[in-house]
Amino acid sequence: MRTSQYLLSTLKEVPADAEVVSHQLMLRAGMIRKLASGLYSWLPTGLRVLRKVENIVREEMDNAGAIEVSMPVVQPADLWQESGRWVQYGPELLRFTDRGARAFVLGPTHEEVITDLIRNEVSSYKQLPLNFYQIQTKFRDEVRPRFGVMRSREFVMKDAYSFHTSQASLQATYDAMYQAYSAIFTRMGLEFRAVQADTGSIGGSASHEFQVLAGSGEDDIVFSTASDYAANIELAEAVAPAAARAAPGEDMRLVNTPDARTIAELVAQFSLPVEKTVKTLLVRAREDAGHPLVALMVRGDHHLNDVKAEKLPQVAAPLTFASEEEIRLAVGAGPGSLGPVNLPLPLVIDRSVAVMSDFAAGANAEGKHFFGINWERDLPLPQVADLRKVVEGDISPDGNGTLQIKRGIEVGHIFQLGTKYSEAMKATVQGEDGRNQTLTMGCYGIGITRVVVAAIEQNHDDRGILWPETLAPFNVAILPMNMHKSFRVKEVAEDLYQQLQARGIDVLLDDRKERPGVMFADMELIGVPHQLVIGDRNLDTEEIEYKNRRSGEKRMIKLSAIVDFLVSEIATAK
């Protein structure tokens, strides 16, 4: 490609509305341009990277035995009503009607469509297992699009769906997809972790996220310092304290605390260790629970894990915290005065709370707390569960090492769906025994556009992007100095350009009438890994200046050796 026939569209200044590095660099490097909130056009440089991501994904999916298909982005509403997600999915699902007043959705995902397709096309267990994938634009009506294409409303996704007649068959495909995803992100040169995850609104029995480590990530991921254990913080188990509960050392007493409405105020005013305090949170109960609210209790220095709380059998989903009005109606006191003593609601406490002694908690009366509370002396031990978020330094759930927490960008997610969709949509095949058998499903997604974001977040410096070799829009940039004035420079540049193209290398020849400083800055910004500077002086010794974008290394290389050198460098990096 020649810059004279290309739209480079680089920017010198950082756009004011770009918050994270990837958004800033994608705009400055001429990769994307905003059309409306959460909607972006992909310019040539960005699209070249996007296509390279797609190609790697496609190759590995094909290698794993998946079959590529293409399904409509517009989907009939009745399929979503049949699966039950018409209501469950909420306002992120863009709904509309056509001129015939028929209801449709703009697809955020395709479980319903693929299930409908397979129930009409596959009739026997002999045709299974099958795994289908597509790479397609999706739409989710995000309430607050942000960070460029990291969280946009329209995005490109690879979604795959597998169909089976047994859990063992599903597990085999799930494992194959796990390995394929690991190969995909390894080929892309990304530092990532595969972590246990919650199944969320997709549903199912097992799930792993593939998280690229980045400080700007939206997720907290947890992993062991001494083993392969890794999980999303929502799912990470907080191991029960090893130490037994200490014997009571104080009598329980009622204390006036009119100015202590928070844990921080209580600790400051009474010089209490925060580890000797508890937080009591009220959430709405299931309709059949017998009480309108359920009380959940964690230690004062810990935080409730909403995902764990929502999985309690007596807690309503989605998790909803009680309003102050509901709290006062149920307990007779405000949120800052809640505690376990004489609480007229069912109570579930975290494992760490179960081993506490001589602790302080609200007295369920305005401006009062009990100090010196002890389980089984002052009140019976209630239901105990894992309720809290883990913290750095906790013991790893597998018993090996301690936990570290880092931020991550989710780029892939695989699920064992089981029969959630096939049961709802009556997707069956004739089993080996001749009877109808409900299909067992898996689904496997990769955010193609998010991969581009994650790669930039992990690979940049103060001059621009440092693309991994496999994702770079161009592998080589040829920068001829004054080629429009020097026939020799132009001839060498053109010859090199033709040779590199013939060897299958993506090369950009900068044939603009621009100052060298502008040419260098643009190539640094868009992140071309290998740069060749051709000048009259160096051609006197038949040499070219080579610069490696990532390492900054510069060296002179003989003109006769440069093509083989680049082919070797690129092959090694890939």
UniProtKB/Swiss-Prot annotation:
One of its GO terms (molecular function) is aminoacyl-tRNA deacylase activity. It catalyses: tRNA(Pro) + L-proline + ATP = L-prolyl-tRNA(Pro) + AMP + diphosphate. CDD domains: ProRS-INS (cd04334), ProRS_anticodon_short (cd00861), ProRS_core_prok (cd00779). SUPFAM superfamilies: Class II aaRS ABD-related, Class II aaRS and biotin synthetases, YbaK/ProRS associated domain. GO terms for cellular component: cytosol. Its EC number is 6.1.1.15. It is found in: Cytoplasm. NCBIfam families: PRK09194.1, proS_fam_II. This is Proline--tRNA ligase. It comes from Sodalis glossinidius (strain morsitans).
